[in-house]
Regions:
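GIY-YIG nuclease catalytic motif and its immediate N-terminal context
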Residues: 1-40, 46-56, 67-70, 87-90, ...
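Residues at or immediately preceding the N-termini of alpha-helices
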Residues: 27-28, 61-63, 77
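Short arginine-rich
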Residues: 70-85
């Protein structure tokens, strides 16, 4: 039986001044989609250039992931930063560590 994972993730911009929380079943694909949309300018991540992964957690069920996303979205920045710091104390951008080359060169080959 195929076991899917569902991810809750938090992105930031280069200066770490904004936080974006999302949910997906394919973490790499979704972050690349945020990156591709950077020139559109209509989404939150495009407007604030939030493509850098600081935090993620996996869930077995989509309902749990969605509930967790909503929970985190309801938090103040300070509480989100506490969660991020527990997971990623150096506040490193995790894109390259998890996905290899970042930003992606050949986006079309990865989608």
């Amino acid at each position: 039986m195929l076991h899917r994972k569902f991810y809750v993730y938090i992105l930031t911009n280069q200066n770490k001044t904004v936080l974006y929380t999302g949910v997906t079943n394919d973490l790499e694909q979704r972050i690349i989609e945020h990156w591709i949309g950077r020139t559109a300018g209509t989404s939150f991540t495009a407007k604030y250039k939030a493509y850098y992964l600081l935090f993620y957690e996996a869930h077995k069920y989509i309902n749990d992931a969605i509930a967790r996303e909503k929970e985190i979205k309801g938090w103040r920045r300070e509480k989100k930063m506490t969660l991020i710091n527990q997971f990623n104390p150096e506040l490193n951008f995790l894109n390259k560590e998890l996905f290899g080359e970042w930003p992606p060169d050949e986006v079309t080959n990865r989608l």
